[in-house]
């Protein structure tokens, strides 16, 4: 129970005394030896101060520090550790993994330059075993992996005594005699560096928090154990005291009997070693150093040094809340935070922070106010309640009592100043937006989001729409009334949509487009409605507004059908036949939809292809009548018609041919003839009626697409023959014939062409054609030769493989005799037995046994 004021914290070295106006300087380590105080900084300086203690009538003390000098060590690294060896008049300084010896008075390095290299941290043996009063025993954790080293440090030299390996990487060390208490990566151990024997203490995870190892007396150490426990251990590996329960985040510990003092990132806690109870808590933020020097406990932040002064016992036994005067207690806590017990202080201090936050808020110091509100975990409804009408009417919130501030509402706070009021509203918008997705908002997200919506709507803020299209907890009734009041009808539609009232949302947007209500939020609201209904799952709602959309714009409105996801298009309500039926009175939309079916979805249905082709044709004819065929749009429609007629094989050719006949559409007529296989008629139209030789060549290409080379050659020969039949008098056809041959040499049979050509044509005229034909012929011949060679090679490989499978060759000569009749062989015909014997075929047939084993049944 924290009921004793055991220590007071007094300043020893103020920030200005140490660093002046140099904010970048920070304290890294301290050392105190008698009246001498040494401070090491991050910029490689050592500062020497003399402390003068003055006793106070209350039993406490104050300290005055007088700066003596400071010295730069010549490195660019921070001073990591300091340790005074008063017997040697030396200061051991760890910097840049090197321990340097400097004079305690003038801070000059020893002339010999003696130093210990390769140290990450060190500890002085306060129970030396060497026996020499003019040396100090030092243990270092080496930069070498899993290694500790023992040194003897003299006035001007150092000497290594021992190097010991450890089972894991050591992180911290304390020394007592021959015993090292080591914090390894996963456990604490006691190691006798003389014998090499070790004793495991208990496991510890150094990755979660840094270890603490402190020598607190002869052969006894204080360690930071798991679960926020301060553990005591002797060199024998046992504990003679019960552990103390301190913070989970302890970063430093010291002993000032009978107290264990612990430092975390917010507090200094004092625990009794006698009953293990926590006796005192002193608020101390940003502290990172806690050490005891001959009974004097020093703590430090990065900017200042403080001393924990133990109070007389009679001063320690006080009950801070005995008088129950809450207001006076709060004032005392604010003025002397370090004197208040931890548990009660947290509650009181949180309230103080909240009050301070409202004070800063009233002064329009919004950044400071926000930090105070967040750190004090303010119920944000306390802040929202200052703004009239922002809390929902259904909210049951009541302000804290006693009140955190003296203001009834924002009008009183700003005294009606509209500019200040606007600033306050902007701050609340920012603050609510920051906390709405954090734990602070848990339990009253509806209040926060509804208030935020009201602020956005009132300020015409762009984030209003972002709020409504993402997950939110805006209350529908309050929010809808507020949006309607501020004429935010588009946003109101989004609110309806979020609350699954799509019909109300769309009707509201339709009214905006129709001009029944005014809201200029979106200039493209019509397109937005189209897009919304395109992906709307409510089929009835889509059909309800389909006519309105198509009446506004057939080309855009039809997108509710054409851009709808494919799985929905296959539903009964949106099947193509129903949609086509509904689009009959909207011709442009009908064309767009049929294009979607035929071109985009590639539906293979004759009805759709024919319908689209007829609509194209009717539009072309209508435009030709009205514009004389000169309008660009008519040309585009005609191009679509021709492309459909060429690419599709599903439309009713005869029906379209009847409609095209006599309509003055020769190209379309030619395409339709081609679809019926009437290629000569088609080419005749292109050549003689239209005189479009390029179109005739294209016809041969697209009409034979997918039909094979023979079909294409036949079409080109037909076209060439048509050119040549006109005779030499038709100069343009002669030129066309020459161009056809020279540009499409590969498509012709050269032999047939040469028989057709007039004798009067020169070789030079047909040079490109002949060269191309020769090139193709040579290429074909060489390709054939290569193929033949490859085939022969492949056959040879197969023959070789076959011979290998048959086995070794059998040699038959004139001296070889039949093993049955002993006569020579007259011809290369024989029977071979498995034993290798060769006989005539007639001998093998007349005998039942071989001359030697095996039997005839085994011959080959």
Swiss-Prot record:
One of its GO terms (biological process) is endosomal vesicle fusion. Its main location: cytoplasm. CHCR repeats lie at residues 564-732. The keyword Lipid biosynthesis does not apply. It is found in: Cytoplasm; Early endosome. The keyword Protein transport applies. Keywords: Cytoplasm, Endosome, Protein transport, Transport. GO terms for molecular function: SMAD binding; transforming growth factor beta receptor binding. Disruption phenotype: Embryonic lethal, both before blastula stage or during gastrulation. Residues 24-297 form the CNH domain. GO terms for cellular component: CORVET complex; early endosome; membrane. Belongs to the TRAP1 family. Plays a role in the TGF-beta/activin signaling pathway. It associates with inactive heteromeric TGF-beta and activin receptor complexes, mainly through the type II receptor, and is released upon activation of signaling. May recruit SMAD4 to the vicinity of the receptor complex and facilitate its interaction with receptor-regulated Smads, such as SMAD2. Interacts with TGFBR2 and ACVR2B; in the absence of ligand stimulation. Interacts with TGFBR1, ACVRL1, BMPR1A and ACVR1B; in the absence of ligand stimulation and to a less extent. Interacts with SMAD4; the interaction seems to be mutually exclusive with the interaction of SMAD4 and phosphorylated SMAD2. May interact with ALOX5. Interacts with RAB5C. Interacts with VPS8, VPS11 and VPS16. Component of the putative class C core vacuole/endosome tethering (CORVET) complex; the core of which composed of the class C Vps proteins VPS11, VPS16, VPS18 and VPS33A, is associated with VPS8 and TGFBRAP1. This is Transforming growth factor-beta receptor-associated protein 1. It comes from Mus musculus (Mouse).
């Amino acid at each position: 129970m924290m009921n004793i004021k055991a220590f007071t914290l007094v300043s020893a070295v103020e920030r200005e005394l140490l660093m002046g106006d140099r904010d970048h300087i920070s304290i890294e380590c301290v050392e105190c030896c008698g009246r001498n105080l040494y401070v090491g900084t991050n910029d490689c300086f050592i500062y020497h101060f003399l402390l003068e203690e003055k006793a106070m009538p209350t039993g406490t003390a104050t300290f005055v520090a007088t700066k003596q000098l400071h010295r730069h060590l010549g490195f660019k690294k921070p001073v990591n550790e300091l340790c005074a060896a008063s017997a040697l008049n030396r200061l051991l300084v760890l910097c840049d993994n090197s321990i340097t010896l400097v004079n305690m008075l003038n801070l000059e390095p020893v002339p010999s330059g003696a130093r210990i290299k390769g140290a990450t941290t060190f500890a002085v043996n306060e129970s030396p075993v060497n026996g020499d009063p003019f040396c100090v025993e030092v243990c270092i954790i080496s930069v070498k992996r899993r290694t500790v080293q023992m040194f003897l440090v003299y006035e001007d030299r150092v000497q290594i005594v021992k190097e010991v390996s450890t089972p894991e990487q050591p992180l911290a060390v304390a020394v007592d005699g021959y015993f090292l208490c080591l914090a390894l990566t996963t456990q604490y151990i006691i190691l006798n560096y003389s014998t090499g024997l070790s004793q495991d203490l208990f496991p510890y995870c150094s990755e979660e928090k840094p270890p603490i190892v402190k020598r607190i007396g002869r052969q006894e150490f204080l360690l930071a154990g798991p679960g926020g426990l301060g553990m005591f251990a002797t060199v024998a590996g046992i504990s003679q005291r019960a552990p103390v329960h301190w913070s989970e985040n302890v970063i430093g510990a010291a002993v000032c009997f009978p107290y264990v003092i612990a430092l975390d990132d917010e507090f200094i806690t004092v625990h009794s070693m006698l009953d293990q109870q926590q006796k005192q808590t002193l608020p101390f933020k940003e502290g990172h150093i806690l050490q005891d020097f001959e009974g004097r406990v020093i703590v430090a932040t990065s900017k200042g040094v403080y001393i924990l002064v133990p109070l007389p016992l009679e001063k320690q036994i006080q009950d801070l809340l005995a008088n129950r005067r809450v207001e006076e207690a709060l004032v005392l806590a604010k003025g002397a935070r370090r004197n208040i017990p931890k548990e009660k202080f947290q509650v009181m201090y949180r309230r103080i922070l909240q009050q301070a936050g409202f004070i800063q808020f009233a002064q329009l110091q919004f950044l400071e106010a926000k930090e105070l509100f967040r750190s004090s975990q303010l119920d944000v409804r306390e802040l929202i309640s200052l703004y009239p009408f922002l809390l929902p009417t259904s909210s049951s919130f009541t302000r804290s009592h006693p009140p955190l501030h003296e203001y009834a509402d924002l009008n009183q706070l700003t005294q009606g100043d509209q500019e200040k009021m606007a600033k306050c509203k902007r701050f609340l918008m920012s603050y609510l937006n920051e906390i709405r997705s954090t734990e602070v908002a848990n339990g009253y997200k509806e209040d926060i989001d509804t208030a935020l919506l009201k602020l956005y709507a009132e300020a015409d803020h762009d984030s209003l729409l972002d709020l409504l299209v993402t997950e939110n907890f805006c209350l529908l009734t309050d929010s809808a009334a507020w949006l309607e009041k501020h004429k935010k009808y588009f946003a109101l539609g989004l609110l309806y949509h979020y609350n699954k009232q799509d019909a109300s949302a769309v009707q509201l947007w339709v009214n905006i487009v129709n001009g029944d209500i005014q809201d200029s939020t979106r200039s493209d609201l019509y397109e937005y409605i189209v897009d919304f209904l395109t992906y709307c799952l409510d089929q009835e709602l889509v059909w309800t507004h389909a006519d309105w959309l198509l009446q506004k714009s057939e080309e855009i409105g039809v997108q509710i059908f054409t851009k709808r996801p494919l799985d929905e298009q296959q539903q009964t309500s949106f099947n193509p036949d129903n949609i086509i039926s509904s689009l009959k009175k909207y011709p442009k939309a009908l064309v767009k939809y049929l294009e979607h079916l035929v071109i985009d979805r590639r539906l293979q249905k004759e009805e759709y292809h024919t319908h689209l082709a007829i609509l194209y044709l009717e539009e072309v004819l209508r435009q030709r009548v009205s514009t004389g065929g000169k309008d660009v749009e008519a040309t585009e429609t005609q191009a679509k018609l021709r492309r459909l007629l060429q690419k599709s094989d599903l439309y009713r050719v005869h029906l379209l041919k009847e409609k095209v006949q006599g309509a003055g559409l020769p190209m379309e007529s030619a395409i339709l003839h081609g679809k019926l296989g009437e290629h000569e008629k088609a080419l005749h139209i292109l050549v003689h009626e239209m005189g479009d030789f390029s179109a005739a060549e294209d016809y041969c290409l697209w009409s034979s697409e997918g039909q094979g080379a023979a079909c294409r050659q036949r079409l080109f020969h037909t076209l060439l023959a048509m050119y040549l039949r006109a005779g030499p008098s038709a100069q343009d056809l002669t030129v066309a014939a020459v161009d056809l041959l020279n540009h499409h040499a590969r498509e012709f049979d050269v032999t047939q062409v040469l028989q057709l050509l007039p004798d009067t044509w020169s070789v030079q005229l047909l040079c490109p054609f002949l060269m191309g034909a020769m090139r193709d012929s040579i290429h074909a011949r060489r390709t054939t030769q290569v193929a033949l060679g490859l085939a022969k090679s492949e056959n040879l490989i197969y023959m070789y493989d076959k011979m290998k499978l048959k086995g070794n060759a059998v040699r038959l000569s004139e001296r070889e005799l039949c093993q049955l009749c002993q006569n020579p062989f007259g011809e290369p015909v024989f029977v071979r037995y498995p034993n290798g014997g060769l006989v005539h075929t007639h001998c093998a047939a007349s005998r039942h046994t071989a001359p030697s084993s095996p039997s005839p049944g085994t011959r080959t």
